[in-house]
């Protein structure tokens, strides 16, 4: 079991520990439970979906990186598939606070990168801020997404964000988590570049059409790729680097162990991810950063 889970693990009920132990002890635990694993854990622990998501929050919170605020937030995104996905807030020293990733963004993006195409609920240990409410309003489940908080009855995103502004106001019909493939190609065969290209092809950028992807290679040779997730309100958009960092951190990778990185984006894109990607990666100690355009 990853060391970051030890403290939270000790506080779990014995029945839940028994049910989760084979899952969390796996060498490459991906910070998610498949639908089949969720079913097994519920049968052993006696918890239903809602109670299990709340019980998993301390483990998700243990994935937080908060060198600035020291305020850890965890989230569990529940997919229509039945899978549960961990999320936690992430902060980075040496770059503007705008590069911060909120727990809800993390859980949603984690699910998206794992291939989930629709969410039914998100459970979080603190009320979602306005930024996160707007970010989640881009999802194809929209205002029907159920939000669960400790000590409160479940509510929908529509109740947390009444009279919202979203994709439909801009006549956008392809929403975040809808399957897409933009069909860009590159002659370059480098696996890291191809991973970034694949991410760009599945990115969500209906407002600027500035599709982009980032792939990170760590010192142990693993590759983590992230896609751009644009938002109708623009500012809550999640850059592709943040998406890649989410996947790396949530699975237990050290974000300071990035050996090289590739950004793939359009050569004449209206917006570019290059400057902020380079600055953030340099702050994380990675100087081998390349931009490739289609």
UniProtKB/Swiss-Prot annotation:
Family annotation (CDD domains): cytidine_deaminase
Domain of life: Bacteria
Annotated catalysed reactions: cytidine + H2O + H(+) = uridine + NH4(+); 2'-deoxycytidine + H2O + H(+) = 2'-deoxyuridine + NH4(+)
Protein name from the UniProt record: Cytidine deaminase
Taxon lineage: Bacteria, Pseudomonadati, Pseudomonadota, Gammaproteobacteria, Enterobacterales
Function: This enzyme scavenges exogenous and endogenous cytidine and 2'-deoxycytidine for UMP synthesis.
Domain (CMP/dCMP-type deaminase) ranges: 48-168, 187-294
Example GO molecular function: zinc ion binding
GO biological process, one term: cytidine deamination
GO cellular component terms listed in the entry, alphabetical order: cytosol
Residues that bind Zn(2+): 102, 129, 132
Family of the protein in this entry: Belongs to the cytidine and deoxycytidylate deaminase family.
Signal peptide: none
Entry annotated with the keyword Zinc: yes
Pfam family, one: dCMP_cyt_deam_1
Keywords from the UniProt entry: Hydrolase, Metal-binding, Zinc
Keyword Metal-binding: yes
InterPro entries: APOBEC/CMP_deaminase_Zn-bd, CMP_dCMP_dom, Cyd/dCyd_deaminase_Zn-bd, Cyt/Deoxycyt_deaminase, Cyt_deam_dimer, Cytidine_deaminase-like, Cytidine_deaminase_bacteria
EC number(s) stated in the UniProt entry for this protein: 3.5.4.5
Cofactor note: Binds 1 zinc ion.
Xref: NCBIfam families: cyt_deam_dimer, PRK09027.1
Residue positions of the active site: 104 (proton donor)
Residues binding substrate, per UniProt: 89-91
Organism: Yersinia pseudotuberculosis serotype IB (strain PB1/+)
